[in-house]
Amino acid sequence: MAQADLRCVVAAGDQVGESPVWSKTDGSVYWTDVCRFLVHQFAVSDETFRTWIFDEPVVALSLSSEPGRWLVALGSRLIWWWPTTDRRVDHGFVLPGYPHVRLNDGRADPLGNFWIGSMRNNLMPNGDLTSAGGTDGVMYRISPAGQVSEHINGLGISNTVCWSPDGGTFYTADTLADAVWAYTFDVRDATLGQRRDFLMGYGEGLPDGSAMDAAGHLWNCRFGGGGAVRVAPDGSIDRIVRLPVQDITSACFGGDDLKTLFITSAAVLHHSGERLAGSLWALACDTPGLAPNLVKIAP
């Protein structure tokens, strides 16, 4: 895809930009800076930019079935958040084993459950990064009623939480293992089945967050690889997009037609000459993406 299709939207200077989510209601993309405990909003129509600060790392965001109400994953727990008033209320889920481990990437499934992975905690109380390692990570599913279940164990850095357009395949990654896997997903009871290797040892950076398009292709961001790859359902590489920064972290589709791929990046490793590291980027795509799944609010 031509470089002309890529532009820097916000030079946010994020230490670790993550978890972009498109909100159709206000025509905005929201995303986080994990290390600075921030949530950003960029409104596309008037190009306004807003930021909120939280009391610990903000690792993932999800819209809910109640307009204006978000689920926010912090390093240690989940909270409900209403951006218009900045009201914040504990969800009830607290990560077992924190602060040895922390939460990381997460999203809602087609049934309204929230899936989120954990990892060994590599963040100091002030947000500075330390080295990550181990296989302490767990993939959790939290139901609308608040029931918690474990579905994958032994993860290094849990990343990528995506579903195929028909909901029948779940994609997830372990950054430390340089692996993206595809699981069969039962849309009746939100359980995982057989696992297959999907993108293993690709060689250009390591797998971070991803986005799914309407054709069933997974766009995987490559931390340290300076780009994103579009991967067909059979695991073959369909397209490679280069960015002028090395550490690409996550992506989501947005815009009125869902044909803009918003991409987050990280400045925390201070690569020489990367003045736009930590920016939010936008890539014009021919194939639209999927609208975000919503966390279901229990009656």
Question: What are the functions of these language-model segments?
Answer:
Residues 116-134, 266-277:
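Short, conserved, GDST-rich strand-edge loop motifs in beta-rich repeat architectures
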